Amino acid sequence: DVYKRQPFPEMWKEIRRVRKENAPTVLFGSEPFSSLLRCGNLEEFKYDWVWEKSKASNFLLAKKQPLKAHELISVFGKGRTPYYPIMEEGEPYGNRTKRGSNWTGIGKVPNPTFRNENRGTRYPRSVIYFKTAESEGKTIHVNQKPIALLQYLIRTYTKEGDTVLDFASGSMSTAIACIYTHRKCICIEKDETHFSQGEKRVRNEYQYLRL
């Protein structure tokens, strides 16, 4: 059984042990893994983001299936989790609302017309576009995520001064995104080579910002 071979029960047990009561858990994935991930915790599953990438992959299978140009970002949490939507810029618009007429003792009196103005800001949609990590420079991990995307997610679910945990930190892009957004970060990585490379990357970035 594919599902039973996944370490989801142990993973969720540890996540619940260390996270705050209403803190969201945000996990990257692709199918069929993402479906298994959601089914492993349907009670806390909230929704998915779809990350539309600037660069597609799976070129070796291009004659058999579409190129893969997206990744899923699944959000979990207990109860009402923090959410600070980052508004998108668009064209300003306005709606007119007319509320009919009223009859009085001297005849029909029209109600005023109300106009709802919007300067163009819109709430985010579930599909978000970000360039891949290669656009930000040399990558050191096969699954390295772009810092810009991680900053977006961090700002969406946390406030300045909060602590972010990345228990599969790889290149430690999350730590760098936390530096830029003034959050604290705890990184965990079981591969010593990746950890060493990621730590060096974070130190270099931190020194650069201090100059």
Regions found by a protein language model. Name each.
Residues 198-199:
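Conserved SAM-binding loop
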Residues 205-211:
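S-adenosyl-L-methionine
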Residues 1-195:
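Core catalytic lobe of class I
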Residues 202:
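Conserved hydrophobic residues forming the short capping helix/wall of the S-adenosyl-L-methionine
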